[in-house]
């Protein structure tokens, strides 16, 4: 079951449609949690159903009710996160998954060593933060910038998830999902979509805004750049609470940002399912 589908389905179907009733029922319970089925798999179920197989019927009925989704635990109402500022300004995917290390992207463990362009000091600082906050999720942050600009979005998200995400399965090493990422100016659109693929959370912090004069005009500095004003502080080690029901971000019990855009009904489905692919395949299966 921890393979989430694919090649394992063939063997689960062999057991579910086999003659041993006890094993068949156990295999069926596992199949009811799976969504990544090929057409050949659903054809086998359909054929067995048409032949009057009761186990096949129970699996198909379960799929029709989307129990593979409805039986999953709900998203936590409150998620505690601790900020880790990856840098000031835009954070490129090349910082997260350098192009010079593209050859190792298929090896998650090896490629993970290149995070922050092999900056071991920064990697150790991240590990230390995690050790000091074992009960919290790390929120990788772009201060005064946008998170995830650049083209290496999938490998970048995979690498971030490897370091700060949740294990997809206790039996499958180096495959993590659901990272929490944030940026003063939000998340690059394609990077944000890819975060959704993993069931992660992307926050638009807006903790810095352009300063205005009494007439409402943007104040410009001597270099012709807008003067920024800090609305609330986000530094490494700061603890925040995401309330997924209220869709608000809190710091020290005070609301600092509305994060409704990160918790649309669709995105919350992705988070509950462990990624957008599970939702897409599940709806097709249903």
Regions found by a protein language model. Give the residues of each.
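Amphipathic alpha-helical scaffolding segments comprising HEAT/armadillo-like alpha-solenoid repeats
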Residues: 4-16, 36-48
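Short inter-helical turns and helix N-cap capping residues of alpha-solenoid HEAT/ARM repeat scaffolds
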Residues: 19-20, 52-53
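Core register positions within helices of long alpha-helical scaffolds
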Residues: 2, 29-33
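Conserved, function-defining core regions and hallmark residues within catalytic/recognition domains
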Residues: 57-137
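Feature captures the catalytic cores and cofactor-binding loops of soluble hydro-lyases/lyases
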Residues: 103-250, 255, 262
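Conserved phosphate/anionic-ligand binding catalytic regions in large, soluble enzymes, centered on
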Residues: 89-93, 147-157, 267-281
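Intein/HINT protein-splicing elements and their conserved insertion hotspots or analogous self-processing inserts
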Residues: 54-61, 65-77, 241-286
């Amino acid at each position: 079951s921890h393979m989430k589908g694919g090649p394992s389905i063939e063997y689960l179907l062999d057991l579910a449609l086999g003659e041993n009733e006890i094993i068949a029922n156990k295999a069926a319970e596992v199949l009811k949690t799976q969504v990544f089925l090929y057409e050949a798999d659903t054809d086998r179920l359909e054929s067995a159903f048409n032949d009057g197989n009761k186990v096949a019927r129970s699996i198909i009925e379960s799929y029709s009710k989307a129990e593979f989704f409805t039986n999953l635990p709900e998203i936590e109402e409150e998620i505690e996160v601790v900020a880790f500022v990856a840098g000031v300004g835009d954070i490129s995917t090349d910082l997260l998954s350098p192009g010079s290390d593209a050859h190792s992207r298929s090896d998650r463990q090896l490629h993970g060593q290149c995070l922050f362009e092999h900056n071991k000091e920064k990697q150790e600082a991240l590990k230390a933060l995690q050790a000091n906050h074992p009960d919290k999720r790390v929120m990788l942050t772009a201060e005064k910038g946008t998170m995830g600009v650049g083209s290496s979005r999938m490998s970048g998200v995979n690498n971030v998830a490897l370091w700060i995400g949740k294990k997809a399965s206790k039996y499958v090493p180096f495959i993590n999902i659901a990272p929490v990422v944030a940026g003063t100016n939000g998340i690059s659109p394609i990077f944000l979509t890819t975060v959704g693929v993993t069931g992660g959370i992307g926050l638009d912090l807006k903790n810095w805004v352009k300063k205005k004069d009494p007439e409402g005009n943007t104040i410009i500095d001597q270099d012709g750049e807008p003067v920024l004003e800090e609305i609330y502080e986000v530094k490494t080690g700061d603890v925040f609470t995401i309330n997924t029901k209220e869709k608000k971000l809190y710091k020290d019990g005070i609301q600092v940002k509305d994060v409704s855009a990160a918790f649309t009904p669709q995105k919350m489905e992705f988070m509950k399912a462990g990624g957008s692919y599970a939702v897409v395949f599940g709806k097709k299966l249903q």
